[in-house]
Amino acid sequence: MSVPSFITAPEFEGGPPQGLSIPFRLRWSKTHPPKEPIVTFKGRTVLVTGANTGLGFEAAVKYAAFGADKIILAVRSIEKGEEAKKRIVERTGRDATDISVLKLDLGEYSSVKDFVSALHEVTPTLDVALLNAGLGNPTYEKSSAGWEMAVQVNVLSTALLAMLLLPLLRSSAAASGAKSHLTFVNSFAHTLVPRDFPLIEGSILKTATDESSWNASSSYNIVKLLAMASVQGFARMEAGEDQQRVIVNSVCPDLCETDLGRKFTGFISSIGKAIFYYLFALSAEEGARCLIGATALGPESHGRFWHHDFLYPFGELAQDQALMKKTWNEIIEAVGRDEPEILQLCRTT
């Protein structure tokens, strides 16, 4: 049996039974993990951000096992990235020369630009970009650019990175004849922001970065909604191309046992996380199946949300196109204040 390069995504027809509370929904997800996709990445060059641990690491292992010609690990620490590379080689038997490690710190715009420059030095092509790196904070923290840190990492710097990657993704698709993939790891949590949530001046971005109203739980959901507006913006932009060459989609692996909440420290937090993960979390390997699948979906997944092995409906606010377009414009303008080239890229792409 030949192994396909792409898989066809079914429309939503499953997932957790409707009306479940969050604990029961998470428990359902734990007992119904994603299926392992049957797909090949032979001939493809793949980038994974946040690749030295958790979901990103397990996704990189799968790309190596599924035949990707080259895997690029984007990591905050080169030392940890090299350790991850060694483990991938040990687990898959791949040649170490097939894997590159590059530094990327999404807390700083300058690091994003340095990373993209380095990327062009190690590969002339890029077929898959899995933007997995993310941050969850127990306390409010500002980036050097003045934004709440999760907003900076998960949304603004990720938007800059995606914009700078698009030209290479497009040219690679034109050369190979197969569409490239730009996949953002997001979360079902974006659906948990209620329709009547009080937005500051009607702005998701201002609400997400406002220190006076910030709390770890609701702000996580708001940031995921903000990120979904970015995904939809990139999808609209790419759909407007004369020849659409890049499939843009998003994916939720559901709750997985990773170190995303690494800053939640202390004895009580550690014990609580251990129990919580035992009861409700998928393993990182199980979650990575979903990520891999999203980057192998066909054009029907463009602008869509992959979750529980289905094209899942967006949350109510993410279906509000006027709000999503307004938020996308705010994201681009926010990045453009410090990195004006993104405004030019928006005009020329």
Curated annotation (Swiss-Prot):
Keywords: NADP, Oxidoreductase. It holds the Pfam family adh_short. Short-chain dehydrogenase/reductase; part of the gene cluster that mediates the biosynthesis of a tyrosine-derived cytochalasan acting as a fungal signal recognized by resistant rice plants and leads to avirulence in Pi33 resistant rice cultivars. The first step in the pathway is catalyzed by the hybrid PKS-NRPS ACE1, assisted by the enoyl reductase RAP1, that are responsible for fusion of the tyrosine precursor and the polyketide backbone. One of its GO terms (molecular function) is oxidoreductase activity. NADP(+) binds at L55, K80, D105, N132, Y220, K224. It comes from the Eukaryota. The active site is at Y220, K224. PANTHER family: PHOSPHATIDYLINOSITOL-GLYCAN BIOSYNTHESIS CLASS F PROTEIN-RELATED, SHORT-CHAIN DEHYDROGENASE_REDUCTASE PHMF. Induction: Expressed exclusively during fungal penetration of host leaves, the time point at which plant defense reactions are triggered. Pathway: Secondary metabolite biosynthesis. Its EC number is 1.1.1.-. This is Short-chain dehydrogenase/reductase OXR1. Belongs to the short-chain dehydrogenases/reductases (SDR) family. It is an enzyme of class 1 (oxidoreductase). The lineage of its organism: Eukaryota, Fungi, Dikarya, Ascomycota, Pezizomycotina. The keyword Nucleotide-binding does not apply.
